[in-house]
């Protein structure tokens, strides 16, 4: 998390000012991806924890070198009236990639032997997919940027005179931080809530089913909300998602069995999907064309801070659970009520934001194939 918070804004800003035959972002995408792929070898060969930690830091650094400029490509290449759908595809691709690797690795465990064991094969598949993805991206983006080099250079020179941090962006960052904190709280403490508060006999199994349901609801909601946000604007869709997430979070406090948990979890998943898709589209809409790399890097700092904040809530939950005269799961009740409040706070903070509106279509863009 620390590496991502430092590397992404720094590399993003450098990429904004880069001029090369491959364009602004591609050199960093290639560098980061290639060295991250090479670093995967070190994971398997590391003889002790110290070496493994160093290898992991190396991989994380290079992943973030590629990731920040890669995310800026949405703002670089997609007209504003299609950013909603692009954001939906981005979120679904993230989830699908993770699901595929989990499924492949799970299938390989224990199925191979000898020098080519499941670890080498899994790492090899990951490296191969990474290199294939950056090859396709690099060719597509390089060709496109070469067609419009003069436009990008003039934008970068002009926009470098202005600061990225504005009151508008500040409100958005705080809003995103609190909503990501709420989302990450469910991911972090969901199993403990099911065990200690709902009282399920097999919380791990219930959580597994719940994840599948949430993933399905989230995927549908992400796709639909991206399309809708391109039609009606980002803020209304984010607010609908935030309100839905807040109400369904409070509804979870009434769950008494696995069936109720499953139903409520699907509503939470759908609401969070709506929120995430439109919120990421709004993040891109707020970006200055010439400083998308730095802008997205800063947005991701808020994302990282929200996820990290959720991890720090554990001791507070335990302390609240032990208050005399209160239920043993009092801490979880406060956590869920607080998460609902954070969803609402995030929506309220977005209300003063001025967006470009759905009628804007960039005139400086090459039509997409």
Explain the meaning of each model-derived region:
Residues 4, 87-109, 300-311:
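Glycine-rich segments within core transmembrane alpha-helices of 12-TM secondary carriers
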Residues 30-47, 243-256:
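C-terminal ends and interior cores of transmembrane alpha-helices
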Residues 39-42, 49-66, 260-274:
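Hydrophobic core of transmembrane alpha-helices in multi-pass small-molecule transporters
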Residues 44, 129-141, 332, 337-369:
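Multi-pass alpha-helical transporter architecture, strongest
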Residues 65-78, 275-288:
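Intracellular juxtamembrane helix-capping segments at the cytosolic ends
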Residues 109-127, 317-342:
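A membrane-interface helix-boundary motif in multi-pass transporters
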Residues 143-174, 367-369:
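Juxtamembrane intracellular "pre-TM" segments in multi-pass secondary transporters
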Residues 188-205:
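Short amphipathic helix-loop junctions that connect adjacent transmembrane helices
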């Amino acid at each position: 998390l620390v590496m991502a918070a430092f590397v992404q804004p720094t590399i993003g800003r450098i990429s904004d000012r880069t001029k090369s035959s491959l364009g602004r972002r591609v050199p960093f995408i290639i560098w980061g991806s290639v060295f991250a792929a090479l670093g995967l070898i070190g994971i398997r060969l590391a003889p002790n924890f110290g070496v493994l930690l160093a290898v992991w830091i190396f991989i994380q650094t290079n992943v973030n070198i590629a990731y920040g400029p890669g995310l800026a490509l949405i703002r670089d290449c997609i007209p504003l009236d299609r950013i909603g759908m692009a954001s939906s595809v981005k979120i679904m691709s993230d989830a699908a990639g993770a699901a595929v690797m989990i499924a492949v690795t799970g299938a390989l465990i224990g199925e191979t032997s000898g020098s080519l064991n499941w670890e080498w094969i899994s790492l090899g598949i990951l490296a191969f997919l990474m290199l294939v993805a950056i090859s396709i991206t690099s060719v597509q983006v390089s060709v496109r940027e070469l067609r419009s080099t003069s436009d990008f250079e003039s934008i970068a020179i002009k926009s470098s005179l202005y600061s990225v941090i504005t009151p508008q962006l500040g409100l958005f960052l705080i809003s995103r931080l609190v909503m990501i904190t709420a989302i990450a709280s469910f991911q972090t403490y969901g199993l403990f809530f099911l065990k200690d508060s709902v009282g399920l006999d097999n919380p791990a199994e219930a959580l597994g089913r719940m994840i599948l349901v949430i993933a399905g609801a989230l995927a549908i909601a992400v796709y639909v909300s991206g399309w809708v946000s391109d039609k009606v604007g980002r803020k209304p869709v984010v607010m609908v998602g935030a309100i839905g997430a807040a109400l369904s979070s409070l509804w979870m406090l009434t769950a008494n069995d696995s069936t109720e948990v499953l139903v409520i979890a699907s509503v939470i998943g759908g609401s969070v999907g709506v929120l995430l898709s439109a919120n990421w589209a709004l993040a891109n809409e707020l970006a200055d064309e010439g400083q998308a790399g730095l802008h997205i890097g800063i947005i991701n700092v808020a994302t990282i801070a929200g996820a990290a904040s959720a991890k720090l809530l554990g001791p507070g939950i335990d302390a609240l659970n032990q208050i005399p005269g209160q239920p043993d799961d009092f801490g979880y009740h406060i956590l869920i009520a607080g998460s609902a409040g954070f969803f609402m706070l995030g929506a309220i903070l977005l209300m003063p934001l001025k967006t470009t509106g759905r009628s804007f279509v960039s005139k400086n863009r090459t039509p997409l194939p």
